[in-house]
Amino acid sequence: MAAVDEIVFHQLLHWHHFYDASTLGVGLLSDGLLHTGELLALVAGCFLFADLLRRRALAPAHAWAGFFTGLGVFQLFDGIVDHKLLRVHQIRYDVDITLYDWAWNAAGLVLLFLGITLTVRARRHASATA
């Protein structure tokens, strides 16, 4: 989700930078650091995923559950902590952001709910087949 946020909202739409309380240069640097961290996490996750495949230990239902739960947690953390509590940045500037905030956090809740639902189903299926 960090990659989607970084690419779409930071680079393509230019709505904000990760850290907007300073100069444009600092904002661009903060975007680069965020993108670097997100990319390192993605590569590490790919190695972990490949290791599960190699060991034939991948449980696809649990993997999808974790994927959507992670998307939702990231979205809500960004919307609540980064946008509202720390005020690192807002979704947009020079507009009423209320609708954007509701849409951003609602999307996070939907993703989180989907992840939790998939987790419950995966656990039930694992218990039934064990």
Located regions from the model:
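Alpha-helical transmembrane segments of multi-pass membrane proteins
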Residues: 1-2, 70-78
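"…centered on the first transmembrane helix and the immediately adjacent amphipathic helix/loop
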Residues: 2-36
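Interfacial helix-loop-helix junctions of multi-pass membrane proteins
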Residues: 7-19, 79-99
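Membrane-helix exit/interface motif
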Residues: 11-17, 44-52
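Residue-level detector of alpha-helix boundary/anchor positions
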Residues: 22, 66-69, 92
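Membrane-interface loop-to-helix entry segments
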Residues: 25-47, 96-119
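Membrane-interface capping segments at transmembrane-helix boundaries
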Residues: 51-55, 118-130
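Interfacial segments of alpha-helical transmembrane regions
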Residues: 56-73
